[in-house]
């Protein structure tokens, strides 16, 4: 929350030394207020910056980037197209397949969010995830998807810090919730597998995320 409050006071546009993912050749195109928010995300989510990626989870457990006994896919994210990302993130791709891909880039965009962002921005499926495109997707997250956060950054009348942080926590797992909240999740058994009803649909239950916890339950 202190980091988000710093955004409200308009941090200078100078990027701090040693920020994960920074290189002399690749710098953010974001305006200072948005860039300040992005710093919080990069530190918690994407140490490789624009080139970062993960393979998702299996039964709620994050998958390793390295796959035992198999060659890891060449994940040059800034050269990856939107359609390639979607093709490599379909549920039918097994956890031990090195081609499997989930969240990508500086802002750890997941496939569902990427689809919405590309539609909002008018990009084609052939568009690559260049740094500028990733920055524009982040702008979509703030301006189109998480408006309470954007309103708080702009100091709009009626904006609320707690709501802003909660929106941030909903989008990025590394950000803790600002207060205790109830969320609806898939119920899991003792082996951490999703419990399903007679029709095969996941059984839902409400759980409480304590202040500072991830909205999505990761430690």
Show the residue positions of the predicted features.
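Cell-wall polysaccharide-cleaving catalytic domain and substrate-binding groove, primarily
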Residues: 3-128, 133-219
